Amino acid sequence: MDRAVEIAKEAIAGGADWIEIGTPLIKSEGMDAIRTMRKAFPDRTILADMKTVDTGAIEVEMAAKAGADVVIVLGSADDSTLLDALRSSHKYGVRLMADLISAPDPVKRVVELEALGVDYVNVHIGIDQQMMGKDPIALLREISQRVNVQLAVAGGLDANSAVQAVKAGAKVVIVGGNITHSDNVTEAARKIRQSVDSPDAVEICSVSTVDQEIREILKEVSTSNISDAMHRKGAMKGIHPLVRGKMVGTAVTVQTFPGDWAKPVEAIDIAKEGDVIVIYNENKDVACWGGLATWSALNKGIAGLVIEGAVRDIDEVETLGLPIYTSNTVPNAGDPKGFGEINAEITCGGQAVKPGDYIVGDESGVVVIPAERAYELARRAKEVYKTEKRLFDEIKRGGTLSEIMDLKKWEKH
């Protein structure tokens, strides 16, 4: 709770008007979260994200008496719940915001919510939906043409998308992680404040393809961030950096026999610029890769190599700078007999790897991201990255990780 108050102070210094107490904080701290924020910020509008779906009157009363000015209920709740919540909001002098998160037909529902008399409707794409590539702007644009109720918007907004939200009709812009997870909360809030106040002065940036966005995110985050986002999974075992450097690319897979370097070298001609060649060679005592192959890979624009097996010509390979991750180095190689196959599913470092999976390597090792979940997991890794940046900032101020995260309180019992 102390961290939340400090973050709120820094956000206000950057220009934030309202303080939203999010659902996880309310669930962990109860109504005391609202009371604490009200005491700390007596002159600010306090928004309590209760996500009420039943007993609307009781939960609005609880939040109002704790100090909330605006209470959020789920827009998908039954009309009887919403009407009773409205009666309670009028009784206790607070405003009611209906949240459209996961509403089956949000455009139809917003018309009904306006007719019921709610004060605000929040066009909200949840965090898990954001990870799948959804954003609220298109929906907000459509809804703003149908109703006159005041519209709020939430869901992964930053300085860039906040501009689009204002232009699409939002009167309230709710920003979460892009402020609270920043290592400079005040500056992050200030940038968004400036975007909201002067939307025409901000140049809207866009990424041309999903693949490009995935690669840009993966270049920014670490393999540790990615493994955390995958619930501690995805990491190859026994694979270590030989030639250090960040590696991001899509997999071209090779299955071959001990020391047989025909298929690994042929894969260079099949791979495209930005691909990572992933090789399972079965034996760590005979090399299937060396200096000449590395030169060839550089000529094709290959992003890097992962080899469960051995590499040789280390003095030469290290000078070339191509990121290579392997399980061993030896001086001896085998012969190019041509056994094996290219671009079939393989197991490398204990991880299943399919052609097209995203492969990321750095100083910590290598992780495999299934292609079908690449966008989602890249976005989740970015959230882990932002959270850790915030923790680093708090540790730099003199705290310890255990104190900041209140580990004893949250140990599993």
Curated annotation (Swiss-Prot):
GO molecular function: 3-dehydro-L-gulonate-6-phosphate decarboxylase activity; hexulose-6-phosphate synthase activity; orotidine-5'-phosphate decarboxylase activity
Keywords: Carbohydrate metabolism, Lyase
Classification of source organism: Archaea, Methanobacteriati, Methanobacteriota, Stenosarchaea group, Methanomicrobia
Assigned protein family: Belongs to the HPS/KGPDC family. HPS subfamily.
Catalytic activity reported: D-ribulose 5-phosphate + formaldehyde = D-arabino-hex-3-ulose 6-phosphate
Protein role: Catalyzes the condensation of ribulose 5-phosphate with formaldehyde to form 3-hexulose 6-phosphate.
GO biological process: 'de novo' pyrimidine nucleobase biosynthetic process; L-ascorbic acid catabolic process
Top-level taxonomic group: Archaea
E.C. code: 4.1.2.43
Database matches in Gene3D superfamilies: Aldolase class I (3.20.20.70), Ribonuclease E inhibitor RraA/RraA-like (3.50.30.40)
Keyword 4Fe-4S set for record: no
Designated name of the protein: 3-hexulose-6-phosphate synthase
Keyword Repressor: no
